[in-house]
């Protein structure tokens, strides 16, 4: 018992100090022991995520969720598994996991809401995309600029041109990403031309 507790203590210190390979070895030794299985699996899943080993994230995460369906750590497991699925190109499972994550916390991370919104958009679920992306744009940064561009596209798909115009305008007036800015400006200009709504000056100047 003392040896197991000592191994867990050393593994936790290694994890906290960024010695992830050492921590992984130590937690792997402990993960088949009932007293340490849940905590060890959780740390192992986190380490694989930090190391971008997404297939292993999913494998360990599945075992953790199956063994401990009511764990208080499951919200974070949903989050990192959702990200792993997204990076592997499985947007259906990314939506499945990230939507569980968002439902399980009062303060979902903006980056995860953005990924969820993009996945919804790519799957043609534009109303859900608007909901997720709309919760992303709380700060003046590159993430919000990208989210506004996707919001504009989502509103266009929903035939809500007024909200689309405002979203494109928000992305176009931000300068964090030049390509996003130009794409937003182009879409904003098209909408102004189409709806004869004047902002930013006359529509003819927008196209210049």
Placement of each model-derived feature along the sequence:
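Acidic, polar-rich low-complexity tracts and alpha-helical solenoid repeat scaffolds
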Residues: 1-208
């Amino acid at each position: 018992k003392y040896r197991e507790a000592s191994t867990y203590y050393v593994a936790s210190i290694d994890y906290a100090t960024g010695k992830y390979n050492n921590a992984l070895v130590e937690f792997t030794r402990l993960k088949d022991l009932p007293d340490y299985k849940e905590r060890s699996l959780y740390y192992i899943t986190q380490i694989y995520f930090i190391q971008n080993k997404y297939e292993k994230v999913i494998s360990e995460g599945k075992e953790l969720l199956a063994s401990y369906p009511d764990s208080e750590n499951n919200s974070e497991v949903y989050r990192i598994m959702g990200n792993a699925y997204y990076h592997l190109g499985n947007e259906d499972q990314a939506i499945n996991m990230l939507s569980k994550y968002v439902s399980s916390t009062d303060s979902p991370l903006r980056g995860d809401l953005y990924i969820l919104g993009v996945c919804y958009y790519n799957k043609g679920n534009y109303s859900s995309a608007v909901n997720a992306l709309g919760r992303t744009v709380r700060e003046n940064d590159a993430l919000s600029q990208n989210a506004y561009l996707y919001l504009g596209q989502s509103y266009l798909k929903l035939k809500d041109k007024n909200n689309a115009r405002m979203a494109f305008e928000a992305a176009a007036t931000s300068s964090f990403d030049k390509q996003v800015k130009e794409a937003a400006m182009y879409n904003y200009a098209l909408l102004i031309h189409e709806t004869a709504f004047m902002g930013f000056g006359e529509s003819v100047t927008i196209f210049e």
